[in-house]
Structure formats: C-alpha cells, structure tokens
Amino acid sequence: MSPTSETAQGGRRLVIVESPAKAKTIKGYLGPGYVVEASVGHIRDLPNGAAEVPEKYTGEVRRLGVDVEHDFEPIYVVNADKKAQVKKLKDLLKESDELYLATDEDREGEAIAWHLQEVLKPKVPVKRMVFHEITKAAIQAAVANPRQLNQKLVDAQETRRILDRLYGYEVSPVLWKKVMPRLSAGRVQSVATRLVVERERERIAFRSAEYWDLTGTFATGRAGDPSDPSSLVARLQTVDGRRVAQGRDFDSLGQLKGANTLHLDEANARALAAALENTRFSVRSVESKPYRRSPYAPFRTTTLQQEASRKLGFGAKATMQIAQKLYENGYITYMRTDSTTLSDTAISAARAQVTQLYGADYLPPQPRTYAAKVKNAQEAHEAIRPSGDRFRTPAETGLTGDQFKLYELIWKRTVASQMKDATGNSVTVKIGGTAADGRDVEFSASGKTITFHGFLKAYVEGADDPNAELDDRERRLPQVAEGDPLTADEITVDGHSTKPPARYTEASLVKELEEREIGRPSTYASIIGTILDRGYVFKKGTALVPSFLSFAVVNLLEKHFGRLVDYDFTAKMEDDLDRIARGEAQAVPWLKRFYFGEGTVEGVAADAGNGDGDHLGGLKELVTDLGAIDAREVSSFPVGNDIVLRVGRYGPYIERGDKDTDGHQRADIPEDLAPDELTVELAEELLAKPSGDFELGVDPATGHTIVAKDGRYGPYVTEILPEGTPKTGKNAVKPRTASLFKSMALDTVTLEDALKLMSLPRVVGTDADGQEITAQNGRYGPYLKKGTDSRSLQSEEQLFTITLEEAQAIYAQPKQRGRAAAKPPLKELGEDPVSGKPVVVKDGRFGPYVTDGETNATLRSGDSVETITPERGFELLAEKRAKAPAKKTAKKAATKKTTAAKTTAAKKTAAKKTTAAKKTAAKKTAAKTTAVKKTAVKKATASKAASED
C-alpha cells in the first residue's frame, strides 16, 4: 500500500527530519497527507553557560549543567535560536494524527529524536522512521516499517555528552588559570593534539644521517621496444656480500642500526664508482613471482575522508559538508558509517554496472563481501555508496564542481569493489660484477607487468586518473636470463639524507585516531576543525603543525592529568561507552567512577588521574588541587645556550637570564614558527635584536629619536621621549605612536615613513555642515571620521591622498554597515560545492577572506591570495559554516605579533646526484628560511572553550 493511500485512511502525519534540504527532498516522495518539517539539527542541549540554566539550579549544577550529586542528571534547555522552530513544530503537531521522527539512524540522530519527543510531548502515536538513503523506494519503505526509539542508544549518547561536558568544563578552566585564558580541553581533541605534538617532538629530537649509494643503467645490447626495453636501471644492493645502507637502516639519532650493513660516505661511493668504470657485468639471477591485488572495500567515513584528502585535496570537514549535500539530495547513502557492508541491492547494482561498462570478464563469479575493520562497527548501516537500485554514473547525475568530484570518487570505489583482482608478474633481476680493486658488487632491479588490470581499470587509490596511472604501475624490465652479459652505460653516485618523521596531515591523523580506536570516526572532522580553530594546530600546506601553545597545553595535561590524554585509557573509555550502548554496562556507576573515583566497577576504565598507587582518584579530585601545577614550569622549554622558550599569556617568546638581571634578554617569536625550526642559531639571532627596535633617526621638529618596534599588537613606530619627561599624573606626556601599514616592514621602514604615520590622524577638511572630516588608521584599517559617523577607506595610502571632495562623495553614499563600497574580488575560485554560489577572495578590514556571499572565512597563516586553491577556499568556508550559528564571544585577549626578517633555521644537507665521470661540485647545503608571520591564537567564549570533544 502506498503512503498516499495509507494516509487517506490514517489522517495527517507529521514527519520531522534534521535539515530543510532533506525535508524538501523527502516531501516529494510522500503523499499530500504528509507534512515534512525540519528540526534544523539539535533543538535541546546542555546549557552553554550559567545564564541559560533555570534559576532553581545553583552551585555546581548551574556551572556544569549536570547534577553530579544526583546520578549525573543533565539539565537540558531549548536552544535560544530554536525556540521559534519548536513552536512551529508544536503547532504542526496539534494538527497531526501521527508523528514520525525521521532523524539520522545513529547515536546522535537517536538522541535528537528523543529530545523532540520530550519537548513536543505528543499526544498522538509516535514512530521512529529510519533510512540510509533518500530515494523514493527507501523513504516509502521507511514509512511502512517504522520502529520504536532505541533507548539504549539514547542513554549511550547522553552518557557520552555528560562525560564530554564534565571533561571540558572541569579541565578547561585549569588551562585558563595555568596557561592562557579561553583555551579548551576535550576528551578527544586533547588526545589528538597530543599526537600532533608528539610527532613534532620526534622531529625536534631527530638527527639526520647522510648516506650514499650507486645507481647503474645497464644495456642489453639489443634494440628495444615498449614491450621489451633495451636497458634497465638498478640500484647497488651489496658490496662483498654486505648490504648497502639505505634510509631505513638509520635510527632517529642518525646512527646505523645493523653492524653488518655497509655505510657508504661520499668519498667511498665515488671511489667505488671509479673502480666500476671498466667492469664487465652479467645477470646473476632472474626471479619471477605472480602478482595479485584485490580491490579496496567500499568507503566508510574515515576512508572517504582520507581518499578525498589524497586525491581531491579536500579537508575532512569539507569532505563531510559535500557528502552531506550529496546525501540530502539523494545521490549517496548516509555518510557517517563505520561499515563496509553493501546491501544485496547495492551489490546487484554494482555488478550490473561492471558488466555494462567493463564487460563480463571483469566480474567475479561471486559477489565480494568485506569484513568490518572498525571495532563496534554499526553493521545496520551500509558503506557509503551511490543511492538507489541502479547507480547513476557521474555523467548522469548533472552534478558539478566538488560535488561531482566526490560523487565520482564514491561511485568508482563502489563499482571497483565488485570487480576482479588485478593480476600479473613481479620480476627481480640481480646484476653482478667485480670492481677494479677486487670488490664484488651486486645491483638489483625490480619490475612488474600487469596481465589483467581488473579493478584497476576503474579505481586506483591515491591517483586521479586510473588510465594514466595504469602505465605507471607497470615497470617493465628487458627479457634477460641468468648469465646474460650487460654493459654499464652509466654509474651515478647519489647522496641522500634521512628525513624526520612526516607531520600528520588531516588524512593521516584521521587514520591514526581510528587505528588507536580513539573517539568515533563520525566526529574526526569536527575534532580536527576544533584543534585548528583553537590555535593548537595550524597548517603548512597539508601538514598539521602544532603551535608552541599546544606544547604548553599538552605538557600540563601529561604531567598532571596523565590518564586523560593516555591513548589506551581514551580508547578504553570509548569501548566502555559502546558497552553502555549495548546494555552491557550501566551509565551512572561508570560516570561515578570517572568523576569521583569511587568504588570499583567491573569492566570500567581506570581512574581519571595518573594511576599511581592503589588510590583511584577521579576527575573532581584532580581539578580541585591545582597548587602542585607550576604555571611557569609547564610553559617553559629549554632551547640551548641557556635560552628558554616560554609560552606567555600573549604568545610565545624566548629569554635568557633572570628578568631582573642586567644580562636578561628577551625576544618574541612568531606563533606560526614550526617548533622544530626553533634552533639555537635562530634563537640567538632573535635575541641579537633586543625588543626588535630599529632606530630610524631624529625628528627635526622635536629632536626626539624615532624607532620602529615589534610589539604585542604588531609592528609600530614611536618616539623616545627625553629622560625626565613625566610618564604619570596630570602632566604625563605620551609618546606619539603609529602602526605600520600592511605594505611596510620593520627592516625597510624609513624615518620619512614614520613621521608621516605619526602625523595621523590627518584633517581632510570641513564639511558643509561645519563638521571636520579626518582620515585615521584604526584597528580594522583606514577610515574617515566625521563626528560619530565613520566610513572605511579602500587602502591605507588614501589616508594621505584623499581630498575633501572625495571624502564628501563617500559620505554622500548610503552607509553600508560602516563599510565602504564593495571592492572587486582579488581572485575567483569557482562554484562552492555546498551553497552552489560563486566563491571569491576579497580584501577586508581583517585581511583577505573567501566568501560565497553568505559565509565569510578569513585566510589563515600559510594561505595567500596568490596560492590559495579552490579546494582550500571551499574548505575554509565549510569549516566556518560548521561553527554556525555564531555565538557572542568575549573580547579576545591580545596576542603578540612579530614581523621580523626571514631567518635561517638549521641547515640541512641537500641530496646530490652526480655521475662518476664528472668532476664533483662542492657540497652545498640547503638552508631553511622561515617566513615570520602572525597567527592569532583563536579563542572562544568560556562556554565554547569547555567544549566536548
């Protein structure tokens, strides 16, 4: 029976989904007797601050939003921005005969459905409607087969929410007191930050080793063709039976691991190459093995994020934003899933498409199934796949831009998962000879031929174009046999340096968190967004670099809240929460154990403290006694030569000596300087310019010395007042001071520039109404001021050039929220995959930003107008949207800004490659230069800072 005919007998039904976009799509699949409305996400939650808590609650309950003394009873409040929507839903419910709660079928969706039921208090029958794809068949099947609310899922999600609230609201204030105001800690975000910091520590401790090897190009003497090349390239493998050292043979301190491994330096490598100039080589062995490679499983949430990052350059958050749109508009199945399972319908659709597009030869006899790799995976969900019982090819969807790219990626992966293995042969050829000095050498070459491409015809992991990549995956070697003579056309000497462990990218951090079973895969995108927004991590290209601030935070947490950032403990907590979801453990005893450290509850994770001794201390005890935490100690890190890095309330700095001694030196350092780039040499260079002062000359009008300084709020110029000038009281004299223009730098600003800057504000003239118009430079950029009416200027140079007539023309225009007329975009990035609107880069009062006309996102450190890509622009917008709705924030604490000249970090030896026949060039070293920029540590309100994950 169709929903339409059913409704005719059953009256009017209200269906509540989470998003307006989903409501619009579903409405078209149901009959006129159905009203489909959106809750627009969560309608109720724990209070964001004490002001939202009902007056009857006091003390700790009011602060936490949870009554820890009465079985951790949560205090829920309807979100202020959802009250109008709740009223609308209540009004619709009054006119309905049934209520269908159609939120997502996961823990969070189940909780939203429960909150809707609790707030709406329906007097009509309530049914839980679930689906994993938004197609007509799926929606009608969901209506016909409703279920009841899963209270176990609701309880588990509530426990998770309470746990995260306690963690965030108890630990974050410790960071405010001991490190910096308005920081945040979270059950998963703090552990993720620790991972990034630990990787940077490994990079700091790393010592590079230089090693050399030889590569030979050997000719068979036959005419070659694509199927049988005439030569092959092989690398030196052994000398007199000893294996030649490669990068993997050195430890992190640059020491050789194995005693029997031969470490060639440059001199020995060149001597060996010279001794091989007239050597006669021959094939010593040819080993051939069958090659087989199976397709990858269909996507789950984390593997989609990783592949979208590698192949498309999307951040985790941007990937989820785009996938959300594809799901809501009926193109793919639900995108938050741990499962790699495909339904029978999906398998049939994929197999049909394999036959249609690639032929029956590419279809295996039996459907492929994939085992779950994620602990506690929700197998009721499917993998992420194209929706429907017949998959639309990417060309058939009509999608464009990033939505097309992501759909194509999902479609290819799904179809390839039901294709045959790729098969072929891998070959290893060993080539030997005797050097002029009698040493025996052996070179090795590896090749691979693919005889049947199988799934590689449709999908190659990590590559954009499968057709182009197929050739790259084949490395053909000449047809040679044991004993065949070979001629060395060239022997090259190659120099290498071992590299420190690579920093995490969003993709590799997601993979690491999942492998350690920390947090839920569905939350990883928001976790990464949080640590970026908090200023704990910033991006250099795709690499995630920890800030010095994060070093201080992690140091404090490791020393005083060890278990809270312990990887195994955090994973065990996640496992416990899953046990609660399955009904195998009770929430309240578990929360008591975590918070109060009381009793012994079987199967529950250990105490929240450091775990020393038999006492099982809880979180409450840990945050109560803060006297043992030395704020200066946790924020101090030795650099060398008695120089110490300190993280202060306004940013990081270095100093040498005691503050009150004559030899004391101090210098600010840029917050986006990668910690592994702060060497002793760089620190000495920064300290060599105490306070960053540059003497520019003497003001002829006053006789005062004019200097340029690098201050807390950025570079500026000021005058040095004569000794004896009163600095306090009613006769106090303040020195003239002015910030540098964006186009100026400390090391290039002149005395003339400084005097012009300090002459501001400039009187432009008097308007017809008798009011004076002045040109001024403020915190948000250049502007005109007439009385209380301010108007922005387009450039700082206008401060000195704008005429009265031009100023009057600006004031004659209607005021646009205090801004000047719109300026042309600096760059166009294309259509946003989420809003569908054109994205451009504009210059605003806070600097360059990307916008689609609805959402604005400031470019971050490492981004520039010249280098920003469309994908990066879309990612910034997606991250900004994810933080909506915007909450009123407290005033930001000041952060220090340093704009020094480029500095040189530790020099690293560049790998060199020269032929034996050529004269050796002098060794060169590649010097790192670090562009010093400002990164403002991002802060949120107290309530936001104490966030969950």
Kindly label every feature range from the protein language model:
Residues 2-5, 10-14, 24-25, 32, ...:
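Basic, low-complexity terminal or inter-domain segments flanking catalytic cores
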Residues 75-79, 311, 498, 516-517:
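Flexible beta-alpha connector loops of hexameric P-loop NTPases
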Residues 206-236, 273, 280-316, 322, ...:
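C-terminal accessory/connector segments of nucleic-acid motor ATPases
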Residues 178-182, 197-264, 311:
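C-terminal helical "lid" subdomain and adjoining coupling/linker elements of P-loop NTPases
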Residues 1-161, 170, 175, 250, ...:
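Intrinsically disordered, low-complexity regulatory segments
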Residues 94-95, 134-218, 288-292:
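C-terminal or mid-to-C-terminal helical accessory/interaction module adjacent to the motor/catalytic core
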Residues 11, 104-105, 180-184, 288-297, ...:
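Conserved short loop/turn motifs at secondary-structure junctions
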